[in-house]
Amino acid sequence: SLVGSEMCIRDRLKGITLTLATTALVACGPGQKQSNFSSSSMHTTETENLLANLKKVSSKGIMFGHHDDTNYGIGWDGEEGRSDVKSVCGDYPAVISFDLGHIELGDTVSLDNVPFSKIRQEILSQYKRGGMSSLSWHLRNPLTGGDSWDVSDTTVVKSVLPGGSNHEKFTGWVSKVSAFINSLQTEDGVKVPVLFRPWHEHTGSWFWWGEKLCTPEEYKALWQMTVDILREDGVNNALYAYSPGSEPQDTVQYLNRYPGDELVDVIGFDTYQFDRDSYIANLEKSLAIIDSIGKTHNKVIAITETGYEGISDSKWWTETLLPVIEKYPIVYVLVWRNARERVTHFYAPYPGQVSANDFVEFYKDPKTLFAADVNSLYK
């Protein structure tokens, strides 16, 4: 078929792009019987390999990501192997993100009504197909009992730090995240690496850990404490991502609440399109900032969340997003979820959506990487 021949051509193009990325990788990934440990770090070998390969991948192309991609989409929920992205272009995203909100409560389903058992299964599936999984955490407010967006009290972060009234409760909450990440194991006992992205968009003030709700020192202490608890709980299969919004205007502002190089592997930012011109300006500004910091701090850089709700622009992928991002060595760009319960709340196309054909062109571009393009991340 024409589609098949187009895909063959596209695969050959991408194969050329990726040859260098895949030939030099040492095999010690999903096929082995158990995780090895790198003597120089607190990471499993697979996790060390992931970090090393992320640094290589960014010189070959940009991985495409989508939140909750295989959990649900427009007009479907929980169907095995289904993906709106795959339905449009024939491949899964190279990166899929998931959210752990409500795991702290001991619930069996997330704040978006996805069973944590399903999230675990999808992370394992993404690992087996060679892609990467990222985790965010829209947790409840430990002081008020409200959600992440409850900013009615400005002392929440202070209350969870050592000596605070909610410190013990919070420590237990983080340990539930530890237990989940530690449970991500293949049948052969290999711990699956994930990118954990806590305390995101903190340069705004819409979450209880936001800029106006804690001091820079309190925010950094929150980060340090979170990573310390995870490490003490034996989590050795996590990399960490720091992702403010697009509010920082320069590197100094970006680093104002940066918790430190020893706690962060990936730096990025979240920004969404409302007005096209200001979106492009925000992208350019924020990409220049993380590109500069990434080089000086030796960090992987990414667009950790972005998108255009409803994608009403039929050429958005190739005429707005791609021309800006292809100029920078970012490792991935991730768009938000296709909500099955809010039919206008979607950020990736589905079959018949107005930008679907353009997304196929975006997919065929040698600079964009999908799951089949990055199957050696852990080797």
Where are these regions (language model features)?
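Aromatic-lined carbohydrate-recognition surfaces of secreted/lumenal glycan-active proteins
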Residues: 65-67, 197-199, 223-252, 299-311, ...
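Substrate-binding cleft of secreted/luminal carbohydrate-active enzymes
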Residues: 62-69, 299-379
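N-terminal export leaders
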Residues: 9-15
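Alpha-helical scaffolding within the catalytic cores
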Residues: 47-50, 76-85, 117-121, 177-180, ...
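N-terminal module-boundary/linker segments of secreted carbohydrate-active enzymes
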Residues: 33-95, 101, 109-113, 373-379
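Short, small-residue-biased leader/transition segments that mark boundaries at the very start
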Residues: 2-9, 28
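Substrate-binding cleft of extracellular glycoside hydrolase catalytic domains
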Residues: 101, 105-236
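Aromatic- and acid-rich polysaccharide-binding/catalytic face
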Residues: 96-98, 254-280, 336-338
